[in-house]
Amino acid sequence: MTDITANVVVSNPRPIFTESRSFKAVANGKIYIGQIDTDPVNPANQIPVYIENEDGSHVQITQPLIINAAGKIVYNGQLVKIVTVQGHSMAIYDANGSQVDYIANVLKYDPDQYSIEADKKFKYSVKLSDYPTLQDAASAAVDGLLIDRDYNFYGGETVDFGGKVLTIECKAKFIGDGNLIFTKLGKGSRIAGVFMESTTTPWVIKPWTDDNQWLTDAAAVVATLKQSKTDGYQPTVSDYVKFPGIETLLPPNAKGQNITSTLEIRECIGVEVHRASGLMAGFLFRGCHFCKMVDANNPSGGKDGIITFENLSGDWGKGNYVIGGRTSYGSVSSAQFLRNNGGFERDGGVIGFTSYRAGESGVKTWQGTVGSTTSRNYNLQFRDSVVIYPVWDGFDLGADTDMNPELDRPGDYPITQYPLHQLPLNHLIDNLLVRGALGVGFGMDGKGMYVSNITVEDCAGSGAYLLTHESVFTNIAIIDTNTKDFQANQIYISGACRVNGLRLIGIRSTDGQGLTIDAPNSTVSGITGMVDPSRINVANLAEEGLGNIRANSFGYDSAAIKLRIHKLSKTLDSGALYSHINGGAGSGSAYTQLTAISGSTPDAVSLKVNHKDCRGAEIPFVPDIASDDFIKDSSCFLPYWENNSTSLKALVKKPNGELVRLTLATL
């Protein structure tokens, strides 16, 4: 019998079948096996029992079972191993027909049997190898299903689990092109170790060198073309934009491919997928709620997104998460959301996840309209995650499209209520790292959000592209971005936002295009790093000094605090405060110089205190007659020269504001 999963051994909780209050064997006795908590002597309560042969095959036998003089079960006089398919009750009768023992549930008494049953309940009760199709196995499963052989599916194959709560343990692969669809999995179901692999090996590109340098020339990218499931991604129309000219260079068999082996969880609630892996793999949660992708085991993505939560019809998705794990490659984004809303509790999003070499963005919230409805997302979490070397962007968390703005938002807030890029997305965003993006490191839009602890490193394009309004950014580090010197700013903020703590340590010079900071409507504070002031464009640069401030100079004879007003000049300092050594190191003397720009010459006018250790002040005089409006404040005087520098005079403003002129000396 090949369709039996008999794995519960029929045995007495005692070593041999004995009478319940003695060590005497029940010689020539009989055993009846039935359902738990029933009388197994009644045929209506009995369950099938089998002899298990050495080759693992099973032969069903009739009851009662016979006990020999030694207290062991025999069949036709031979010792045999008897098994059944489930927990059971047991009644034992002696040779005279008297009941000597009754056990309502053997599992309560036998730790070994309990372990077998517990293992079955928490792992599987049905093996795929015992059934011709996955649907047959799913229909037979009670509480679990073991995928113990490779299963070849056809695209669109649908498996209906009938609402059962199952643990599906995968020890083998699902192989096929297209979607394998799981429906009606009960709330609390768990799929562990699933491995999806395409039948077809696609043509892939990898626009980087062996030493991980980006390739941007179309011909160089096409030169990397090869068939592989493990090293690259299938080119898409996005690559036609990223690498101009590549479309005409690619051979026909590398265009329009759509090779993905996708496990689709359709319209389920509370299903978790753990330790998923695969080659050309995808995992699509369509119309799902409170579902989780947990600890992805580095699946290599196919043509579609690797992990997708899509709720374009029905209710907005809620409670859907990517938690932990890592993915590689894929032609689209590693983790993406379409029309999800986590509500005020921010129930949903990405936590503790790593994306490597995504063909588009590492983590993406879709923007704009898809079909006839919005694909935008609200109230999600994006925390503690890393995106490494994506072909496009690291984290793309926008809602409105930028390149082709829509006139309205079907199924969403109208433009009249929330203008372009000003939706109340309310995402919780904290502790994200992007390294080496060929596009933008971190991008988003929206209004009224708080974003903290973002680090972007070594990106070819902008470090941060923020179409945000009235939002607060705290602890943002942009390090060595716009390395390809694109027509891009290292940081761009469109609306009136506040940036508190902007670290720019290690910024590479970008002598070609773009500013270091372009935030024409924002207030920025806490900038650190070697930043060229001419590359800063902000509405307000606020650096409040709390307590004592000290400017230290190491290895130089001077310390300086320099001032620059960009409305006056983006390249020249408007004023400065210097401290210079009098004499050499250790002289114990210095002088202080206060300067101002004049005639487009910085430091043209200066006041010096203690120059040459004189213990006095060097005051500049106006070189010609001073006009009355030269002096600004009362109780002040302004020295000036008159009569071809032969008469030294002073313009004095008395405490009452009256002006008088005094002759100090005639030469």
From Swiss-Prot:
One of the protein's GO biological processes: virion attachment to host cell
Active-site feature positions: 360, 393, 396
GO molecular function, one term: endo-1,3-alpha-L-rhamnosidase activity
Cell wall biogenesis/degradation is among the record's keywords: no
Subcellular location: Virion
GO cellular component: virus tail, fiber
EC number: 3.2.1.-
Oligomeric form and interacting partners: Homotrimer. Interacts with the host O-antigen lipopolysaccharides; this interaction induces cleavage of host O-antigen. Interacts with tail hub protein gp10; this interaction anchors 6 fibers onto the tail hub hexamer.
UniProt comment concerning the protein's domains: The interdigitation of the polypeptide chains at the C-termini is important to protrimer formation in the folding pathway and to thermostability of the mature protein.
Task of the protein: Structural component of the short non-contractile tail. The tail comprises six spikes that mediate primary attachment to the host cell lipopolysaccharides (LPS) and display endorhamnosidase enzymatic activity, hydrolyzing the alpha-1,3-O-glycosidic linkage between rhamnose and galactose of the O-antigen polysaccharide. Digestion of the LPS brings the capsid near the cell outer membrane.
Family indicated by similarity: Belongs to the P22likevirus tail fiber protein family.
Protein name according to UniProt: Tail spike protein
Gene: 9
